[in-house]
């Protein structure tokens, strides 16, 4: 469960390391985002000579959360940290690699490029 002011790790090689959630997209009164949701973020930490710089505003899709997410078969999945992947206006990832596992819920949200780049889908 991600809300405004949440700090997330970045799970791609776009150059950003930490991002700060400034808006949850999907309705004016929406407070929380979960796996597969798109948020607006500000880059708080970035590597030098990278595609994104500190202070840049971008969109990101959440790929891992500490909060458990229920599945239709009754099982739950949760991760050790909150992570996101930066995306462009066409909903394609900015980076060319994804680090760590991602949740299967991204497939239902049509983020196939992220699914194909991820080393493991749980």
UniProtKB/Swiss-Prot annotation:
Q: Spell out the GO cellular component terms annotated for this protein, sorted alphabetically and separated by semicolons.
A: cytosolic large ribosomal subunit
The answer to keyword Signal applying to this record is: no
Query: Which is a GO BP term held by this UniProt record?
Result: translation
Q: Is RNA-binding one of the keywords UniProt gives this record?
A: yes
Which Gene Ontology molecular-function terms are recorded?
large ribosomal subunit rRNA binding; structural constituent of ribosome
**Keyword tags:** Ribonucleoprotein, Ribosomal protein, RNA-binding, rRNA-binding
PANTHER family the record matches = 50S/60S RIBOSOMAL PROTEIN L14/L23, LARGE RIBOSOMAL SUBUNIT PROTEIN UL14M
Query: What name goes with this protein?
Result: Large ribosomal subunit protein uL14
């Amino acid at each position: 469960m991600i809300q405004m002011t949440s700090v997330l790790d970045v799970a791609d090689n776009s150059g950003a390391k930490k991002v700060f959630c400034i808006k949850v997209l999907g309705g004016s009164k929406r407070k929380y985002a979960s796996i597969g949701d798109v948020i607006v973020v500000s880059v708080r930490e970035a590597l030098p000579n990278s595609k994104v710089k500190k202070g840049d505003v971008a969109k990101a899709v959440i790929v891992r959360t500490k909060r458990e997410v229920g599945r239709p078969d009754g099982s739950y999945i949760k991760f050790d940290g909150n992570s996101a992947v930066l995306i462009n206006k066409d909903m394609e990832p900015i980076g060319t690699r994804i680090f760590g596992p991602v949740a299967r819920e991204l497939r239902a949200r049509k983020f196939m490029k992220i699914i194909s780049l991820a080393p493991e889908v749980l």
